Design a protein with these regions (language model features):
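Thiamine diphosphate
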Residues: 152-292, 302-309, 440, 460-492
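Peripheral docking tails and interdomain loops at the edges
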Residues: 350-358, 480-482, 501-502, 631, ...
Length: 696
């Protein structure tokens, strides 16, 4: 056979040296077929078995050897597809064997698979009739980044956030039992997602309900970053003991010595381990689950045997498998954090490339043309390090988003002041509250979409007590390819109604830095919201300043002062730049030369600059327009409406036209951030169209 350019010398699970090309003959062994790839193909690879599959029913007749060939073809296809479209990468490569085994054994979609988070569902999409559409994933009008019920009957539950699968699967199981429908429900959850309290709430109830539920714990020692905490150490103990709870033909647990699996080099977390663990030493067994594992999640014959027997066991069952994030692609195995997700490759027509070099080239090209533009997460990271060097009371908390929130440097410089609490948003918020009662000043770095999960704690444990906690809210606004599940478009609505909360929205990197400082220095509960991605290129003027709380700034005025139509455009956050571009174009158009537009950078959502709002009446403003990257209902514009209509006597008399521009009352589908903004009428052209309609 001819050597494939995509394979290299590697080690299989049994330690056998591999240098063989992709094969389709059933005589190949498991060890021979488990390939490691070094390169991402630029052209569509040959995948004859995969190409013949239109749905899970097509693999039911496959032999075990054919399934193992399919695994290699699927892995190679996902490498190619990721290079074409980008997307979540490492998690998908790690569950290919499991995905194939589940669809082979289960009668999907009659039997139902629930994927936690959904980062790992690309292979599932391919096997369920979406192979030819995978190149559109995360693109406008293409496949979604996560399982979505509206996309396929095989996507049994919509996901995107963590730790929801067992609750959803339990609900399905109980409903099926009530309707006397004997179907299997399998929940696939990672060890990172297992750190979320919701997962344990569901497991507790599953035992209480004695539900027939199959939970598969995909343990790769990672979420986006490395898994941490006591639960992670417990899983390591189960692995490092050298024993496993196997399953007999009768379904009974059997404690036995685990075969040596050289493919895994687990982190050693314990200086001493017990020789032989007892079943009662197992957390899942103690809760009341029937536990089997740990098993090699990349061994197809083993997976088929174990899952086939486990799904016949009544009651809640957990099968614990070990996998490698980025399995089969050497650079991703070596750097699972860096390869959690990738951008699509450059468009040059290269047959194959060394992806480590390609990744460096992408990074270089990304930095070119952007000057010194920083990501907002980098601005936060710089502020955090600068302030911590001056104030030893600063402590920083994140729920498993060290890299994404820009906290790597802080964690290295101040490890004793950095607290990654894993995927536990509720705990993160109340933890900060507890810290604040002892005289320190905690900052909680959290994505807007995930702050939703800690809302009760924010009200009850922070704001009600007016505790000195600052929330650095990243990914506020539309987030692009991750779509509606990750959009940060509700935070203003649920924050500004909470007493004692101050809320700031910076227009650029410099304001972000100084508003973070302003909120940190304030004695009370505060929040600064900022978007995903890079800023405008504004330089940060150090040292850190304190802005006046509740003060807006008139940024610019366009159009003649004698114009009969005077429009005040109240822009919140990064929409200031959009407002200025729109106003400049609008007033330069001869059609609108009877209009003057002043751009007001509101800076603060709460408190509003009510003094400035009152002066607008004195200036004879005829139109007031608010502009925000947030839902209109309950957002910053609503706050302006409430003040003008209920608390301003002057406006009760003059009654200027009031108009709100923001995100409409619908979930915004995935696409690029620019496409999403255009979809909502929040790009420059969209804002101009809306202003023209208002002025006409």
């Amino acid at each position: 056979m001819q050597q494939s350019p995509y394979f290299s010398q590697s080690q299989s699970a049994s330690g056998t040296s591999l240098s063989k090309p992709l094969a389709t003959d059933s005589a190949a062994s498991f060890s021979d077929l488990q390939q490691t790839f070094m390169q991402i193909p630029r052209t569509r690879p040959s995948t004859p078995l995969l190409d013949a599959i239109d749905g899970p029913s097509d693999i039911k007749s496959f032999t075990t050897d054919q399934l193992m060939v399919l695994v290699d073809e699927l892995r190679l296809f996902l490498l190619y597809s990721a290079g074409q479209s980008g997307g979540h990468f490492g998690a998908n490569l790690g569950v290919i064997e499991l995905t194939v085994a589940l669809h082979y054994l289960l009668d999907t979609p009659n039997d139902q698979i629930v994927w936690d988070v959904g980062h790992q569902a690309y292979a599932h999409k391919v096997l369920t009739g979406r192979r030819d559409q995978l190149g559109t994933i995360r693109s406008k009008d293409g496949l979604t980044a996560f399982p979505e019920r509206a996309e396929s009957v095989y996507d049994t539950f919509g996901v995107g956030h963590s730790s929801t699968s067992i609750s959803a699967g339990l609900g399905m199981s109980l409903a099926l039992r009530y309707q006397e429908r004997p179907q299997t429900v399998a929940c696939v959850i990672g060890d990172g997602a297992m750190t979320g309290g919701m997962a344990f709430e569901a497991m507790n109830d599953a035992v209480q309900q004695d539900a027939d539920l199959l939970v598969i714990l995909n343990d790769n020692d990672m979420s986006i970053s490395c898994s941490i905490g006591g639960f992670s150490r417990h899983l390591a103990m189960l692995w490092e003991s050298g024993y496993q709870v196997d399953i007999s033909e009768s379904g009974a647990p059997i404690l036995c010595q685990r075969p040596n699996m050289q493919a895994f080099d687990r982190r050693k977390r314990h200086s001493a381990l017990r020789d032989v663990p007892q079943l009662e030493d197992n957390l899942f067994k103690a809760i009341g689950f029937t536990y089997f594992g740990p098993f090699d999640g990349h061994n197809i014959p083993e997976l088929l045997r174990v899952l086939s027997l486990a799904k016949q066991v009544s009651g809640p069952v957990l099968v614990h498998i070990y996998t490698t994030k980025g399995k089969g692609f050497a650079p991703a195995e070596a750097d699972p954090v860096g390869y959690h997700a990738i951008s699509k490759l450059p468009a040059e027509d290269i047959v194959a490339c060394d992806f480590a070099q390609e990744k460096a080239a992408i990074a270089s090209k990304t930095s070119e043309g952007k000057g010194s533009k920083l990501k907002y997460s980098q601005v936060f990271g710089q502020f955090l390090c600068d302030k911590a060097a001056q104030d030893d009371k600063l402590l920083a908390i994140t729920p498993a988003m060290e890299e994404g929130s820009g906290m790597i440097d802080f964690a290295r410089q101040f490890p004793e002041r950095f607290f990654d609490v894993a995927i536990a948003e509720q705990h993160a918020v109340t933890l900060a509250g507890g810290m604040a009662t002892q005289g320190v000043k905690p900052i909680v770095a959290i994505y807007s979409t995930f702050l939703q999960r800690g809302y009760d704690q924010l009200i009850h444990d922070i704001a009600l007590q007016n505790l000195d906690v600052t929330f650095a809210i990243d990914r506020a606004g539309l987030v692009g390819e991750d779509g509606a599940t990750h959009a940060g478009v509700f935070d203003l609505a649920f924050l500004r109604c909470v007493p004692n909360m101050l809320i700031a929205a910076p227009k650029d990197e410099n304001e972000c830095y100084h508003l973070l400082n302003t909120c940190y220095e304030y004695q009370g509960s505060t929040a600064v919201r900022y978007p995903r991605g890079t800023g405008t290129g504004a330089m940060i003027n150090r040292p850190a300043q304190q802005y006046q709380i509740g003060q807006a700034i008139v940024e610019s005025v366009f159009g003649p002062g004698h114009a009969p139509k005077k429009l005040a455009l109240l822009a919140f956050g990064t929409m200031v730049a959009t407002a200025e571009q729109a106003a400049k174009r609008l007033t330069s158009d001869n059609v609108n030369n009877d209009c003057q537009v002043q751009i007001i950078n509101m800076r603060w959502v709460k408190p509003l600059d009510t003094h400035l709002l009152e002066t607008l009446n004195e200036q004879g403003v005829t139109h007031i327009v608010t502009l925000e990257e947030h839902v209109i209902m309950g957002g910053a514009g609503s706050a302006v409406n409430e003040y003008l209509l209920n608390a301003s006597p002057a406006f009760a008399i003059s009654r200027p036209a009031i108009y709100n521009i923001g995100i409409p009352d619908r979930f915004i589908a995935h696409g690029s951030q620019a496409e999403q903004l255009a979809d909502c009428g929040l790009d420059v052209d969209g804002v101009i169209r809306q202003l023209q309609r208002l002025l006409s």
